[in-house]
């Protein structure tokens, strides 16, 4: 920048920009870093110089020692120069930081500028009959002085800082430590593009293209009509838009020999479409319909040819990588199948046995097997030992089945389910023991009247009681065991109250002046048992035919 530019801005702008910046702190920190780097370079150079001096002094004799010293000499010189450059860079940055501090000290502050504006306003407000003309002129001249001072300060700061940055030395890359006459290492990887070019030249395709196709392309490209049309933005567009151009040996060698990866594929296509977009924009900007039409045609051919060439290179590279990875991937793919190939003979026989199921296709289905009667589950309430049942077991008649195989295993009865009997819930229904004794007496009387079975069915009927006696004998002691309800339950004594008519409900009905009469008769209405808890409940359900009419109270 020049002084007039700084002079064109008011001092408030320069003061605000200079005072609101980061200050000289970052420059001083950077200068300290360059000083440290210079010291590190110097220490490394001293160490290497001492090592080379020891080699020359006789630690390592022979011609190889001289070669070793000669190989390290350029690197030693670079270390010394890098140390000097780093020190110079630190000095330049310190100079720029000092210039910044000087400019900040010489720049009028925002407070001074604000005070000048405030004083100018007061003088203008109190300037009656021009009495403040001289103070106003002095204040304005002071503001002009600050304006010039700010511009001069910025110009000086720019000159010093620019010179410091421009004079900063640049360090070159470190030289390699190699033998002076060492041959250049040849690349181990062959150039496939060059190999394809040599093959195309060997078969004569290169000569045919150079002698026949390329002259024709050049003639089309150099047509005055096309040259005048595209000379303004892309004179090579007629050549790139010619499909014969993509048949050149260089393009074929690129498609078949360049190792294309996904990133390069995307980068090449992006670059091509960027060029095509620029050509289309220039053609539409010209406004010439012929230019737009030819540009669309040529760019379409260029896009198709580039996509085909790059896609061939990408597919070829992916196929080569896949074939190279197959030897390493086959063991990984075969690892899950190894247990099947190394399975023991027993496992193989198990799989081979499944083949016998194929012979069952032609065998007719057999009759369903007859399931023998399942033994009834024993009741959980303890009962006395029953007498033999008179009824013989029914004989199941089954249809004959062909001898196709071993008979199915017999179905065995499930084991009797044992659990807490109803006596454990005596607190819900009272006098369970008496009810059990009554049922025992009734059951015994009924079974005593059963006629004896015939002699032919006697063994079968005699075996039935034995099967029922054992569960009952095992369940009988459970009544007296712990956790059976009677251990911690106190039953209320039987009061023996007779059931009476309920005083609740509709109340006394009839004519006025009638009285309540309780007379024996047929039970009707609502019947309750007064003062009844659990102990005085009926032992058997009351049915209409067994109601006790004497103990009921009729509500009339």
Swiss-Prot record:
Coiled coil: none annotated. Residues 319-340 are annotated as: Leucine zipper motif. Residues 201-256 are annotated as: SH3-like. Residues 400-417 have a biased composition (Pro residues). Pfam families: PPE, PPE-PPW. Residues 385-418, 443-556 are annotated as: Disordered. A motif (Nuclear localization signal) lies at residues 473-481. Residues 456-471 have a biased composition (Low complexity). Residues 8-164 are annotated as: PPE. It is found in: Secreted; Host cytoplasm; Host nucleus. GO terms for cellular component: extracellular region; host cell cytoplasm; host cell nucleus. InterPro entries: PPE-PPW_C (IPR043641), PPE_dom (IPR000030), PPE_sf (IPR038332). The keyword Secreted applies. Residues 472-481 have a biased composition (Basic residues). Keywords: Host cytoplasm, Host nucleus, Secreted, Virulence. One of its GO terms (biological process) is response to host immune response. The keyword Secreted applies. Contains a conserved PPE N-terminal domain and a variable C-terminal domain. The C-terminal region includes a SH3-like region, a leucine zipper DNA-binding motif and a functional nuclear localization signal (NLS). Inhibits nitric oxide (NO) production in activated macrophages. Acts by inhibiting expression of the host inducible nitric oxide synthase (iNOS). PPE2 is translocated into the host macrophage nucleus, where it interacts with a GATA-binding site overlapping with the TATA box of NOS2 (iNOS) promoter, and strongly inhibits NOS2 gene transcription. Reduction in NO production in turn facilitates intracellular survival of the bacilli inside the macrophage. Belongs to the mycobacterial PPE family. This is PPE family protein PPE2. It comes from Mycobacterium tuberculosis (strain CDC 1551 / Oshkosh).
